[in-house]
């Protein structure tokens, strides 16, 4: 049986929120089978649980925010991407503020954190959402068009194309495809950092955003070049970060996908819209399990083994 996965033990991290600049503590705990991934705001007078789902997403400006009532957690996508890359199904995430810490601006610190806690197999089958028919969302026309699509595929692969009119971005790859079957998430995707432009930072900070951002947790560019002294981690780091984000946004479905995701100029809003469009068409998907893990698509049968 291809089994559900959780952590072997709890693990903790401390950091600051990218947009809030607030100090925040994370405690990641094992969770029972079929409980899913739950963010728990433990700083409130009464702790509030926020279970991940497309409907829990209430804001997609610059990041993905999930809510339950008035309780919110911002910028969940990098941690969710790490959970997707490691195949974690069940997890309780205690958080002491309303934004996940940015750490180094990628998912690699979360991957290290989760792997250091160890991964435990559980006595319940892993449930996948297998796409049976294409589902697409699209906005704009001509030069302003953007779209995202899920298509049938016996595995999980993502392709993304960006279109930034900037010298530093133009000189890198603007299209990339990643297949979970490669087993290379930690090596090829997780280290890609979020990025921004100095011309936007002042405006964002005036609006109370990017207060925790800097050269140690983002790629920062002026009108011509990357300002980080160490340069880029990948030649195509910008578009690889978009794949990283998409994996995190799509994992808010609550189950791993068996699908080919493709997108052009998509972002958090369109990724969430795509999940809601999928849910609106139950004939477009089915829930499947694998009694024999060897029959599972490559990339899931070969996820990092439990420690």
UniProtKB/Swiss-Prot annotation:
Residues that hold Zn(2+) according to the record: 78, 241, 245
Annotated keywords: Hydrolase, Lipid A biosynthesis, Lipid biosynthesis, Lipid metabolism, Metal-binding, Zinc
Catalytic activity line of the entry: a UDP-3-O-[(3R)-3-hydroxyacyl]-N-acetyl-alpha-D-glucosamine + H2O = a UDP-3-O-[(3R)-3-hydroxyacyl]-alpha-D-glucosamine + acetate
Any Pfam family: LpxC
Gene Ontology molecular functions: metal ion binding; UDP-3-O-acyl-N-acetylglucosamine deacetylase activity
Domain of life: Bacteria
Record PANTHER family: UDP-3-O-ACYL-N-ACETYLGLUCOSAMINE DEACETYLASE 1, MITOCHONDRIAL-RELATED (PTHR33694:SF1)
HAMAP family given in the database record: LpxC
The protein, known as: UDP-3-O-acyl-N-acetylglucosamine deacetylase
């Amino acid at each position: 049986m291809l089994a559900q996965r959780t952590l072997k033990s709890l693990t903790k991290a401390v950091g600051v929120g990218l947009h809030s600049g607030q100090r925040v503590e994370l405690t990641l705990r094992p969770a029972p089978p079929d409980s899913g991934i739950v963010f728990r705001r433990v700083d409130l007078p009464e702790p509030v649980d926020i279970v991940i789902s497309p409907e829990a997403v209430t804001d997609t400006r610059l990041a993905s925010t999930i809510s339950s009532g008035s309780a919110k957690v911002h910028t969940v996508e990098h941690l969710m991407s790490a959970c997707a890359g490691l195949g974690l199904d069940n997890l309780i995430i205690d958080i002491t503020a309303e934004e996940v810490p940015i750490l180094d601006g990628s998912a690699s610190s979360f991957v290290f954190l989760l792997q250091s806690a160890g991964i435990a197999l559980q006595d319940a089958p892993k449930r996948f959402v297998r796409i049976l028919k294409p589902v697409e969302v699209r906005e704009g026309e001509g030069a302003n068009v953007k779209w995202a699509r899920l298509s049938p595929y016996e595995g999980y692969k993502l392709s993304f194309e960006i279109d930034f009119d900037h010298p530093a971005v133009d000189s890198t790859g603007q299209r990339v495809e990643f297949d979970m079957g490669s087993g290379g998430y930690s090596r090829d995707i997780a280290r890609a950092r979020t990025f921004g432009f100095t011309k936007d930072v002042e405006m964002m900070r005036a609006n109370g955003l990017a207060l925790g951002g800097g050269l140690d947790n983002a790629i920062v560019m002026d009108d011509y070049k990357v300002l980080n002294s160490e340069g880029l981690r990948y030649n195509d780091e910008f578009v690889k970060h978009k794949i990283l984000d998409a994996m995190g946004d799509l994992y808010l479905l609550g189950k791993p996908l068996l699908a080919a995701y493709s997108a052009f100029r998509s972002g958090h809003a369109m990724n969430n819209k795509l999940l809601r469009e999928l849910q609106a068409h139950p004939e477009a998907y089915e829930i499947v399990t694998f009694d024999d893990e060897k029959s599972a698509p490559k990339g899931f049968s070969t996820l990092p083994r439990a420690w």
